[in-house]
């Protein structure tokens, strides 16, 4: 115990002077009790900063046993030193060692609970039934009746009544029972064995785990000892006080967040009151919050303790008499009683010199919340001298230490650079903004540890300062320390001599300056310098910089003191930062003003002549306090930044003047006053320090006077003498106190009697406490002047005064509740009547405004108007409770939770506002970022949440977690949900097509390349992390690592590569322009009819173009696959959670037809194959089915090495679903977009399939067959990468099926050429791994392409294949200077693949064509054997002649050429080009080429000999190699002795009428279904684990003819588009006609494309609206029929558009129709109120809004919400003018403003939130034809005056003005920053919004467009134009 007591003493006295909690003995008693009763080592205990409870560091096992009601000794933290444990107990420290956690122990002393406690309301349970208005009114009436009766009885009846007092329980029993009911567990006896009364008296208690309210901070355990009651809580990391103090931006601009906090607090208080428990004197510290602002209430049980009279007396004596211990253990001294005073008293005491500088600064640190020993938030004091000279030179306290250290130039540079970055970043970028600032921190944790390095363990220093231990790099002297640091000083350098003494053997002690003989002397001298006159006079400037008004605003910028923490508006929670205490200039210390000195200054009657002054110095040792620093200042040149850059003070001038006066020789006075100079110079100086005496060292010499000038007798005041100085200083102090501290006079207390404590009065006190707490939250910056432990009545009076004086600062939503709780208004405002610990502050009136005194239940009632809680709060609260209650440990529970939340989400979103979404969104994002819930949350919740957010916010907040879910390295069960076509359709609709293609599609496609590729591909595709070989890496890709967000409670998690924001940084829409404020017509973001669940699944219909998995197209694909021999396909997808059941088929006949034409031909593929001479395969399996080719069982066996952690079945389902989705998406996007985005990404992915040595291993079977001898030469010999690349190749070839052969020749082949092209540098170098993989991918893809090329096409591009593909590949393969990263293995694989490719081409084109076109590649390949043979056999010497450093030696070969040779690569080449390789290539090529081999290959004899040698080594008894060719011709077993596969397997070899069988060429018989050659080919699978996919052995296959095949204009346009850079921001119009859409019988009045760009709408004079598909057909001359016709209009339709959120169509013919584009059903019709006043213009609000704005002919603007009946708003636009009819309306992209254009050319801008007209101006001289609004508050208008004008919303002059020469621009659309215009003269123009006015105009030819142009719409992603004409035909042009 002695050791424990000593340790505890260290903890208790760790605070500096004035630093310990208010009730030291009480807290010390609590510490002792916890140590004794809970068996926790004293080292592991510490007091909480407020002194209200004890924080304990305990092991998680001990805590788990405590939860199970077993209490044993808590293990000690053996591996941690005392300093480390002390650091771990600090609030700002969040990372704890594994196996350890922190808890809070709250204690109640039983002896203080001995008073009786009167019963209030009986214990009652909350009702489960919803509250009704009738019930609410009944309860109010009954309570009013009871209260009025009781009030009357106490007033009139009780004085005359002699009835006995009602019985009351002892407070101890009442509290014990209430705690058990509230926390749902019983007390566990601890300490000495005692009879636990709770089990006897309390009756049944709830079972463990059922607390009364989830909004209460849960209790880990309730413990009872003979003397104490304990409540053990989990540690609270952040409180509401931290939010309002350090992260106020988290609550800024959102009243809903504050109200939701209040809502949860009231829920908790209501639960406590129902159980008979008061909450105590709550403060902001008692409300625990997390990053999601989910609050939990921590009760203040100490309020129940009633101190006895003796303790009261002791407490007062202690408070008034004793001080607080100093940090030094042995030194205990008293301090003045102002430690507990409010800030006003502290300021006055310091100003008047009654307390020291040190004590005052420590109190300011305490008020700012700084905590002793906290490395992140330790107290700070100023450095005052620089230690360079004896007693140092004083620093300039007008500048921060950071500024003095860094210099003004660097700070200006930092501020300017961050300011420019902030301006450049703007609101549109996703990256965290760069905020202009000068200073990052006042005292960083690194500086703190460097300061205390001598006393801090080495492990801690290595963890925080520098990982490598370098003791000599730490500053060795105080002078070096002070010079090095940019941060301020710490109190230890003023108080603790031990800080200089090192505990490390290899680190010397910190040296004190040479002018001090010991550490103790330095500390005393340093402290004296802090208290010196020079420091005191300027200390107020330092306070202004560190705690005062110079921290923010213009003053901060002027003083270069803008602190990052105060201006970055961070929303992550933190428990430390920079706190501003004062917003007014701090008064200066009054150090004996000469104006009010005890003696008046001598005023001479003679004019003073110029005086020469001489100063001297004397020894000043021992007189530092009396102004020694001042003498040092005079003796030392003031040249550095440490000197003051201001003129001498009035004190200096006064001294000089008085010394001169003393030396003046007056008649009879000369020399009479030798000491007057010193006595007058310092009257009252340093009144707080040692007794002042005469200032030493001052000697003055008098100057002579001219006697003739002394007779006038003028009165001369001393220079600097100001008689009103005292008045000015008094006024400054008064202003500071009034404005900065808001102090007021105190009224004397009146004695009052102490009535008995009643529970009801405690409940009333709780409500008053709640009012105080709310007011403190509102006035957080103004109540910092209160002491942290101020009593409740002090807090109440402070906030009550603030509420009355600053009522306008109170948010409107909180004004009624504050008025009710604190009784601010009324006939007489309450004053504090009782100041007892258990007394209410004042008595509530029995009935106020018809309601009883406030209670939590009353405030929570929806029928009470006291707090305007939004209607969605209960549903939101229920949603959050469900989220918190469910513990998810596996995917099954994750799915159940996501489904349960989805069921409740509809009720939440029905009435939610943008502010409510800010509260909800972090919970959804958290679910989407956690491993077990990510997939199911995305599946269930993405659609409704993204619908409510709108596209802009959905991209901002949901994109990152979606990327994380797609990139997760773990095999998540059900992951295939994310790859279903219906889910991807939702992504396209809710994120926007362009955003989906740019940001998400690359991540979606990565699954096709396997799990490992999704990480490797990050390098080449989306820039994520490096590849990892492990199947389950510790952390996922950089964009989102599961669990990362929840492991660390502190700093925000790192952003992804896209710079997307993390939800931990807070969700706030206020800085955007896409979500409105909470006005009525935009307050809710409604969801359309909630889809009904199908088999417990969320069904969400995407949009019209979604092709369902159960559509005929998909079924046709499946049929094709099944017929082709993959029976497992359907069953595998159907197993488990099949997407077949999740989406209803909504595709119409045309959709099915357009896909069906492809499917039909795929289904007929068997017949085509059978009758073709040119194809060997009888099915198209891998290309037509999503499943990987072959039967499912074999495929799974092949993939097992890749997916050791998963079942092959899940992987198969995943790939199946993903491939189907890619096929669907490729058809949906159209040829140009599919090629630009899908095909390009797939081509990049193909390379990733071969990266790494693992992917380059041949697949082998159980026998040891060498892979080189397996099968025919042109057959595929798969490596692992071939298996992985199967789905990628399948999807690539499907795009070729859709759009035809040009995809192969114009897109794939150029990319292959790019992959194999040699590097730009001339010097040969080693390949990188990605280039190596690219070569393998290129050869593999080329082999696939060759099979599908027609004969004509193949011969046309054969020269390109030879020169751009084969020769570059052979150049790498046969190079003597280029090495492969994977060595011989990669070169061998490339060699085998290249042989197969060349052989395939040879078989396709025949011998003659080989000689004509392929002789060079074949010869080049064979030549390498000769070169190697010469180097090996003849030992050809390498010629070093002429080789300079860095050059390779060269060798001369038999052909006479000299070639460089890298000697280090010879071994690699010899491993590749072996005898076996020679045999493998020579035999088939000799058969393929016959006699031509002698002409093509000069060294064929050498290669033949090498092949013979290999044959001899394999079978020595074989025949002579010379007879090899006849041998090959006759038999064929020699081809592969092990496998038995013979060369006759070659089958049909040529495509020019000849077929090779063995080495004989013959014309084959037609054998459509003959299994002969196919059967032998299939046997290859037994030789090397090869795939038995028949199509891999095909020489030629026909591409099915698709309805979407490119030809004519479509082909020309597609060829152009794939060559255009994706970064090209300009719109190019080439007038290429792509499609026609006839159908309307009248002129087309309006055209509008849907956001997904696969359908568009048109309205016509024929009173119909038509829906058209946008899929490509034919050659540009095809005509497409409409998909749906809406014919409910009665007049000409002049407007059509789409409401994005609900996906409804809005059309107008004078009345507005809202209808469903899926069914054509009318949902709503809005007719004009007066038929004579029709609607003339319509516009829809952008997502997420569902409002429609309409203008009528009477210049009235009306808003309609399609979800609600009736009108929302009605605004008049005319304003008394007669501007004419409204011709056009446009809504800003944010939805915050709408602009109307009139027929008179007038334009009006209206704020949609307030209805106020922001601006009205005459914009044009003629009729306004069209208006559009763009991001950045830009408006574009066109008029009949031939002009197109670009405006800024609130600027008077236009930014650009375009004038059309001949015709007005009557229609236009936007493409990025360009405007595409159309005129009635059929001219299309393109002009820029950014550049000076210039316009490119194109006249539409009559061949491409007939009629007159009436309307125009642009497809921005596809870059197409839809043009409507007056003849009813719409044309698609590009």
UniProtKB/Swiss-Prot annotation:
Residues 1-26, 305-336, 665-717, 1018-1044, 1092-1175, 1187-1209, 1515-1544, 1562-1599 are annotated as: Disordered. Coiled coil: none annotated. Gene3D superfamilies: BEACH domain, YVTN repeat-like/Quinoprotein amine dehydrogenase. Pfam families: Beach (PF02138), WD40 (PF00400). Residues 1-10 have a biased composition (Basic residues). GO terms for molecular function: K63-linked polyubiquitin modification-dependent protein binding; phosphatidylinositol 3-kinase inhibitor activity. One of its GO terms (cellular component) is early endosome membrane. Residues 673-695, 1566-1580 have a biased composition (Low complexity). The keyword Mitochondrion applies. Changing residue 1349 to P: Progressive ataxia associated with Purkinje cell death. Retinal thinning due to photoreceptor cell death. Residues 1-645 are annotated as: Necessary and sufficient for the interaction with SQSTM1. WD repeats lie at residues 1639-1678, 1685-1725, 1777-1816, 1819-1857, 1904-1934. Keywords: Cytoplasm, Cytoplasmic vesicle, Endosome, Lysosome, Membrane, Mitochondrion, Repeat, Transit peptide, WD repeat. It comes from the Eukaryota. Transmembrane segments: none annotated. Disruption phenotype: Brain-specific, conditional knockout mice are born at the expected Mendelian frequency, but most of them die a few hours after birth. If they show no overt brain morphological abnormalities, a neuronal accumulation of SQSTM1 in foci is observed. It is found in: Early endosome membrane; Late endosome membrane; Lysosome membrane; Cytoplasmic vesicle, Autophagosome membrane. Expressed in brain, Purkinje cells of cerebellum, retinal photoreceptor cells and spinal cord (at protein level). In brain, specifically expressed by neuronal cells (at protein level). Detected in a wide range of tissues including intestine, adipose tissue, liver, pancreas, thymus, spleen, kidney, heart, eye, sciatic nerve, and testis. SUPFAM superfamilies: BEACH domain, Protein kinase-like (PK-like), WD40 repeat-like. Residues 335-612 form the BEACH domain. Functions as a negative regulator of the PI3 kinase/PI3K activity associated with endosomal membranes via BECN1, a core subunit of the PI3K complex. By modifying the phosphatidylinositol 3-phosphate/PtdInsP3 content of endosomal membranes may regulate endosome fusion, recycling, sorting and early to late endosome transport. It is for instance, required for the delivery of cargos like BST2/tetherin from early to late endosome and thereby participates indirectly to their degradation by the lysosome. Belongs to the WD repeat WDR81 family. This is WD repeat-containing protein 81. It comes from Mus musculus.
